């Protein structure tokens, strides 16, 4: 198979993947009206391996190539741009790479199908407390937060020295 053609076998097979795309296309207005991708679509993304695609094999992931991942995202985005965004943004290894290994192990302790969401801007203040950090603020949006397993947030730089390496 040419490298520039999406291999649907990597994503649950042609029948499953095409049915997902058809369902996404049919429900675009619903997603727009609700201002979110429905939970059942996020679950189907998990089933076909969207969120474990780039997770290293040592953590139970599929460790697919970036090209394979992006071709899948492109197909979903062609069906609905917001669904493509939630599929691509929910992929978490890129965001977790900066964390200490023991934190990454905790995130994937129950399996690689972890859905990431983020409300990064504007950064908000964080304070060290027993057992972690207290983050207080309001983020204007958090892409994919309704279907997320883990939510990353931006913290203000005024606390950098206190929070480094955590």
Task: Describe every region a protein language model picked out.
Residues 138, 155-156:
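Fold-independent oxyanion-binding glycine-rich loops
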């Amino acid at each position: 198979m040419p490298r520039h053609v999406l291999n649907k076998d990597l994503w649950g097979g042609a029948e499953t993947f095409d049915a997902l795309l058809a369902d996404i296309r049919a429900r675009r207005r619903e997603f727009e009206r609700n201002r979110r991708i429905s939970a059942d679509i996020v679950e189907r993304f998990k089933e076909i391996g969207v969120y474990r695609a780039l997770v290293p094999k040592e953590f139970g992931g599929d460790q697919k190539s970036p090209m394979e991942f992006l071709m899948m995202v492109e197909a979903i985005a062609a069906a609905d741009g917001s669904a493509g965004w939630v599929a691509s943004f929910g992929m978490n290894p890129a965001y977790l790479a900066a964390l200490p290994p023991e934190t990454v192990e905790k995130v994937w302790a129950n399996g690689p199908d972890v859905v990431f969401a983020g409300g990064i801007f504007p950064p908000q203040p964080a304070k060290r407390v027993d057992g972690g950090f207290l983050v207080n603020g309001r983020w204007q949006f958090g892409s994919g937060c309704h279907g997320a397993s883990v939510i990353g947030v931006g913290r203000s730089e005024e606390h950098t020295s206190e929070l480094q390496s955590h």
